[in-house]
Amino acid sequence: MTQQLPTLSLKKIYSGKVRDLYEIDDKRMLMVASDRLSAFDVILDDPIPRKGEILTQISNFWFNKLAHIMPNHFTGESVYDVLPKEEADLIKDRAVVCKRLNPIKIESIVRGYLTGSGLKDYKQTGTICGLKLPEGLVEASKLAEPIFTPSSKEAVGSHDINISYAECEKLIGADLAAQVKEKAIALYTAAAEYALTKGIIICDTKFEFGLDENGMLTLMDEVLTPDSSRFWSIDTYQEGINPPSFDKQFIRDWLENSGWNKQAPAPKVPENIIQKTVDKYQEALDLLTK
């Protein structure tokens, strides 16, 4: 039963894997985070209760915390400024009024540790996205410094593809690529330092950037949530093993072991796995913001 968000009086202009966008005017839109969950680029039938609210709170926390590094998509307005009260009441904890930006056509991924597709690439070639790494690194090795490893943006339902920095420059231009790389690494570095003080290692994360009407690079979409990042607990971190994470890893692991072929439709996820996932998202919010 895929979650249906309340019908709003605004015009829906986009429905993504997790978020729906509504038009306010030519400068602003409303972004609403659903409880939908995607794994292996397939949207699961079962929503994760309150996930959209938790993700929105985590994102908003980081947008504010990192505002000194660069501008973000906030307009400063609340949902009550753009919706009738009865509609705003229903989505106030999962919606944000944001600027309409021209999205940059790459996924800006920063890695501080080696795991996932980065580890796979490294094992095969000794590099990630064309960047040479030292020999002898293993699962969960901390990198000497954070690296920018962009991927191309594919259509919903397709897998994003890791690209080299040179390919990134080709796609978006050398000047913009340099700005994106610098800002992405600065955001990751500041966030990772803060998170460590709260007992969380940010292994890697994906940022989304856009350009405003004046061509100013602006942080958008979601920031440093368990959906866009891998969070590990300092307590369970150990080089050489894949640490448990504060995100949909429970569900991904269950799906990996279920014999599913990773094509839609996905199998039904057991209630206890869904509850564990909610608890992990909530724990990430509590640790980061308290």
Please name every model-derived segment.
Residues 1-152, 262-289:
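Active-site loop/lid in soluble adenylation, ligation, and acyl-transfer enzymes
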Residues 28, 103-105, 199-202, 214-217, ...:
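Coil-to-beta-strand transition motifs
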Residues 172-203:
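A long amphipathic alpha-helix within ATP-dependent nucleotide-binding catalytic cores
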Residues 110, 202-223:
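Conserved metal-phosphate-binding beta-hairpin within the catalytic cores
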Residues 124-128, 132-176, 219, 223-288:
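Anionic ligand-binding catalytic core segments
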Residues 67-73, 190-202, 215, 289-290:
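Surface-exposed helix-capping loop/turn segments at secondary-structure junctions
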